[in-house]
Amino acid sequence: MTSQWRDLLPQAAAASSLDATSDASARAAQFAALQTGSFVSLASDTGLIAVTGADAAAFLHGQLTNDVERLSSAQARLAGYCSAKGRLLATFLMWRDTSADATIYLACDADVQAAVQKRLSMFVLRAKAKLTDGTATHVLLQVGGPAAEAVLANTFPALPAAALAAAHATFGDAPTSLIRLPDAGTARALSRFLWSVPVTHAAEAWAALTQAPGLTVVPPALAAWLDVHSGVARVTTATQEQFVPQMVNWEVVGGVNFRKGCYPGQEVVARSQYRGTIKRRLHLAHASGVQPAPGQALIETSDPDQPCGMVVQAAPAPDGGYDLLVEVKLAAREADDVRLGGADGPALAFADLPYEIIDPTETPASSAAAS
């Protein structure tokens, strides 16, 4: 970490802290920036694993749920890492840069990064692949809006035009990547990006963004609201080994390739898909009260002794309460009387995801045909 960014990091972290939004008008301005304006958020809740070596792609291809060998630098992909029982240990956004060693990056929840990186490293064996902490070399920023795009245009000749498209450039003498994030449905019509900034130039990038007219700094806890509305689940420590990928719509959003070779848990994932045994799915919902925690149980009032699902992730909503992604039994969702934490807990008000949940007996074209 450069001394300049080390000196600036406390200031950036303070500006990105949820405590900085205790003022109601400030929080309203931040949500306005998320919904219709320009913003930057220090993605301190996201970890990054860098994978290098001649066998990096082949190694990851045999470990993850999606095709890594045919991952081009022009695109990013979602992928999962499963246990032998087919349960997700981590969910990734992955991309390959255009540096000489074509480094592959895996962005995941910060709390699971170290353990997952260590576990993956155990299986490298004789493969020419090395996993390192990507946060030591790059800072992740979530950005969006015209003011942010004007800053990005100084580094990237063309911005990614479609969800999960990627662009690459050189910032100073270091590689930098820009990924267009999945759309956030009705929460935001404008595009948003994940910018992987070389730590050697992080202070410069942060200053350019935060000094841009019309751009608002937003805490990651609020920026997570857009992640919730994208319907792309994030596995955290509290939810590791709780879900087969289909339970969180991972194959629907393109995170599973059913035509690639084997990986840990592949037989379970494939059997669940083709036998139509998935009876739980990811849904978008709203709840009042205190902030829901990942892993918190959901209860159907007609069967209060047996949880019908759990919270995957949650974020504050603009008009109060919290929007959340929940994994829930299909039957309980249809009954539409699900509560948070107990039969007397806050009721969930379900909303539409920005994509259609495909029947589990059908192989989504986006997953099967990924290349």
List the model feature ranges, each with a label.
Residues 26-36, 81-93, 122-127, 169-183, ...:
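Short amphipathic beta-strand starts and helix->beta connectors
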Residues 2-5, 92, 248-256, 270-371:
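Glycine-rich, small/acidic residue-mixed loop/short-helix segments
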Residues 97, 134, 181, 231, ...:
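Residue-level recognition of beta-strand microenvironments
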Residues 55-60, 113-116, 148-152, 200-208, ...:
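Short, conserved charged micro-motifs
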Residues 1-78, 82-83, 87-89, 98-99:
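Acidic, proline/glycine-enriched N-terminal capping motif
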Residues 216, 220, 226-251:
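Short, conserved active-site entrance elements at the starts or edges of catalytic domains
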Residues 39-43, 47-48, 93-230:
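Acidic, low-complexity central loop/insert segments
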